[in-house]
């Protein structure tokens, strides 16, 4: 059986990167929440 996690940095960045977050209203809300919380890293990518 094929494993479900097939890592790819391109897919990772496109889905979870900073520019992906900035592209949608809800993504910007995610960043705003993380800024308000004082996160050192806004995105994991």
Swiss-Prot record:
Biological process terms from the Gene Ontology for this record are: translation
Gene3D superfamilies linked: 1.10.287.3980
Q: Which InterPro entries match?
A: Ribosomal_bL34, Ribosomal_bL34_CS
| Keywords linked to the UniProt accession | Ribonucleoprotein, Ribosomal protein
* One GO CC annotation: ribosome
> Coiled coil where?
none
Q: Which PROSITE patterns match?
A: RIBOSOMAL_L34
**A GO molecular-function annotation:** structural constituent of ribosome
Q: Which NCBIfam families match?
A: rpmH_bact
Q: Which family is this sequence assigned to?
A: Belongs to the bacterial ribosomal protein bL34 family.
- Matching HAMAP family, A to Z? Ribosomal_bL34
Name-wise, this protein is: Large ribosomal subunit protein bL34
Q: Which gene encodes it?
A: rpmH
């Amino acid at each position: 059986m094929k494993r479900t996690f097939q890592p790819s940095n391109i897919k990772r960045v496109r889905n979870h990167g900073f520019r992906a977050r900035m592209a949608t209203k809800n993504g910007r809300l995610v960043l705003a929440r993380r800024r308000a919380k004082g996160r050192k890293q806004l995105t994991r990518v």
